[in-house]
A protein has these predicted regions:
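Core beta-strand-centered patch of the WYL/Sm-like small regulatory domain
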Residues: 170-190
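N-terminal low-complexity or simple alpha-helical regulatory segments
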Residues: 3-162, 176, 180-183
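Conserved short histidine dyad/triad with adjacent acidic residue
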Residues: 164-168
Length: 190
């Protein structure tokens, strides 16, 4: 018998135009490929703590939501601790539903300063130029967030930092896709 995906039997679905992701239910297990080891992508708990704070301020009980996405109370105690990236995605998408805010991911990113990003924020703020800051984010983002890839693109005098979920099944979810954008718009501009 395979262990349950999450501690809770409650389920909710995250939708995007081309798929439905369901958390909290027994998944259809496929035979292992290769050695059968599955790598769980991790992220610092920092942004999950910000989301939990938003839910508390709005009067939502956190225990049920935490269990639905597979998080324990201790997972949200230290911003430097690591949680599963899929649980973080579940939390931000669930928060958007509970807060009835279709732009929650965007607002979450815009409501925090670059300094609220821990190591990545420190690197960005201590880079001599915006170009250097974005290059450093591309280089080091996986240290704090294994769930996204960053690509720094240069075109003439312009440049952009593009994020993409490492796990293809999570790509395109609305709130996770929009959160990183505004938080880097405040990086050093010289």
């Amino acid at each position: 018998m395979t262990p349950p995906l999450l501690a809770s039997s409650a389920a909710f679905a995250l939708t995007s135009p081309d798929r439905i992701l369901t958390f909290g239910v027994e998944p259809d297990r496929q035979p292992p490929v290769g050695n059968g080891i599955v790598r769980v992508l991790m992220i610092e708990a920092r942004w999950a703590i910000y989301i939990a704070d938003d839910l508390r301020r709005a009067g939502h009980a956190l225990d049920g939501v935490r269990k639905e996405v597979g998080l324990k109370r201790a997972d949200l105690a230290d911003p430097e601790s690591r949680i599963a990236y899929a649980a973080y995605v579940g939390l931000i998408e669930r928060a958007a539903l509970l807060l009835a805010d279709p732009a929650y991911g965007l607002k979450l990113g815009a409501s925090h300063d670059v300094r609220d990003n821990g190591l990545i924020g420190f690197l960005a703020l201590n880079s001599p130029t915006l170009n250097d800051a974005l290059a450093n984010v591309e280089r080091y983002v996986a240290v704090t967030n294994e769930g996204i890839d960053a690509v720094f693109e240069r075109a003439g005098q312009g440049f952009a930092l593009r994020f993409r979920e490492t796990d293809a099944s999570l790509r395109g979810l609305r709130h996770i896709r929009s959160r990183p954008l505004p938080r880097w718009s405040q990086a050093p501009a010289n």
